[in-house]
Structure formats: structure tokens, C-alpha cells
Amino acid sequence: EETGFGLPAGEEVTVTISASVLSGGPSVKSNADPGNGDQINRCILGVYMVDGENGPQPYGTLSYEQVTGQQATFEDVTLLTGYDYKLVFWADNVASTTNLQTDNHYVTTDFPTVTYNDGHQYMSSDDTRDAFYGVFDLNDFSGEVEDSYTLTRPFGQLNIFTTDCDEIKSDALKPAKVRMTFTSIPTGMDLINGSLTEPAEGAGGVTGEISAIPDDVTSPVVTGARQLSFDYIFAPEGQQRMISGITMNFYDANDSELDITAY
């Protein structure tokens, strides 16, 4: 008996694998209701056998499970002892848990590469765009796995605050909504190697819909500063990435643009 890579098969073992969404993190909705991953309701598991020079190769098909209580459990995952594997997780929000394979904000059809969904207009300050991932090695698999694997965000969170909102005396002139435009942010990520999908030359970047300013979020650093937006942006792990080409336009509650110079 051989595996799909022409390798002699080891002992077939069925295991249960759990993944947990890391709770806590930056405030995203309001001071009283911080971003804690509670909008995450789907988790995908891809198993990859490490095949020497060919690198990680898909082993079996992708598994989908609903996230409940910030945890997803994958039962009856079958592996062969004696081989090296990578377990690749992606957890995000879907519109309905009755069909977990239907993507929402992020496209996973080329998993383990995940990209923005071009069919969904980008929107700032949207906690359903939160997501988590993790890549874990099983070397010389002996039949044992961790009790649970903790996932982390693949993003840097861009938070924009204003320090002079209170200087606007008329409430009618104070912005209630903003629109963000980005010309150079990554549009996706290879979850296994961490490489980012760069925007195509001349693609025009990412232009968001008009989105409401988060409710009553103040800066933890500058007293009196008010948050205007937050955005989840794919970022390299443990490295800095400069972001250029950011524009913010300002609107009232009725989506009419205000006479405020774009930022």
C-alpha cells in the first residue's frame, strides 16, 4: 500500500484536532465591546504531507467545522504514522453556517492562499472581517496531537484617531462616517510560507464603502482622541511593512460628503 506520493504507507491513525481562536486583542467596536473574535464562525483545516524536495503536498481534502465558543473541533482526521505533516488552519466569518464552504470576505478556493473577496466591496470598521490562522508541524507523526492549537491574526490592525473632533462646534459638520482607499496594501496571504499577495500593477488598489465611525472608542494613548476607523491588513509576521497611498474621506450620517479635506 502506498500514499499518493508513492511512499510506503505507515499505520493509519484517526485523531481529533481542535483549534481555538485567541481571545482578546485591540478594541474594535466600542470600549465596552472589544474585538474578541466573537464574529468568527467557520474554521478550515488543511493537512499537508511534507514530501522532501516537493515541499508540503495536500493530504486528503479540506475539512470545515463551525466555530462554537471560539473553538472548532475536527473529528476523524486520518494520518499515517512516520510521516511529517503541516496542519494549516484558517478561521473567519461566513454569512451562514449551513454551508461552511461558501466564502464571505475572504476567498479560500486556492487554499492555503487566502485573498480578499473581490465580489464584496471592502468596508472599514467591520468586525466580521476579523480572521485567524495557524500553521503547525507534526514531525515523524507517532499518533499523538496537541489537545488544542491556538490561532492568531494574520493582520496588522490600522487604527486611525482624530485629536481635534471636539473643536468642530456644529454636530452637523462632525463626521459620522468615513471611506478608506488604499493603493498598496496586500490583498492576500499564503498561509504556509507567509508570503503576501501584492496588488496588481495599475489595479487601482482597494476602495471601501462608506462605513460608520466606531462607537465611543477613545485612544488608549492620547486623552480625548476619537477613533475614526480600524482596518485589518495582511502583514508579515515579525516584520514591519510600510503602507502608503491611504486616503480617508468624511461623510455625515446620510452619506453626504462633508467639506473636510480628505486625509
Language-model features: where?
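Structured interaction patches on ligand/partner-binding surfaces of diverse proteins
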Residues: 65-67, 95-146, 216-218, 255-263
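A short mid-domain helix/strand-loop element embedded in enzyme catalytic domains
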Residues: 141-142, 150-152, 179-183
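Bacterial Sec-dependent N-terminal signal peptides
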Residues: 1-20, 160
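Surface-exposed interaction/gating patches
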Residues: 152-169
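Tryptophan-paired
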Residues: 32-102, 167-263
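Beta-strand secondary-structure signal
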Residues: 14-18, 44, 86-88, 146-148, ...
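Short solvent-exposed capping/turn motifs at the termini of beta-strands
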Residues: 21-23, 164
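Intrinsic-disorder/low-complexity, polar/charged segments enriched in Ser/Thr/Lys/Arg/Asp/Glu/Gln
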Residues: 12-16, 71-73, 144-146, 157, ...
